[in-house]
């Protein structure tokens, strides 16, 4: 994948398939500690220990439509290529947490990409679900929560094209103002 927003899209699609109703995404930039942390948490059905152990194997997938599942293995590989780490925690009935720590200054760390477009797309395509996105850096913090957006819309669908465009611009402009990399 060419940027982190595409990894985020892939992981969140897994969360949606697992029946999650709330999916939280966090990014923490810390150049002083040379870390760029991506964390995605959901309240989906979770995984048993056997599935959890196999989840980062590219030749394992719970899907019946294909025989490989590259999302988690590619994210793990991209984190480790920068000197970072990857962890996957899950408990049946409670949800799953994916955490990738990248070397902040490493030349192979992927750019964030169009996170506003990804979050707006996911929110519009899944109006019954709730998404949060938080981004923290030394330059500031940004929080986005579809529950707040839905409240402000007063009956207008979060799937409306103008709302989608607004969410994308809101997220990307705020991230641009605080992103250090």
Residue ranges and their predicted role:
Residues 2-7, 13-69, 73-108, 133-142:
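Conserved beta-strand-loop-beta-strand hairpin that lines the nucleotide-binding pocket
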Residues 8-9, 116:
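Short, hydrophobic/amphipathic alpha-helical packing segments
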Residues 2, 78-181:
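Flexible, glycine-/charge-rich segments associated with ATP-binding catalytic modules
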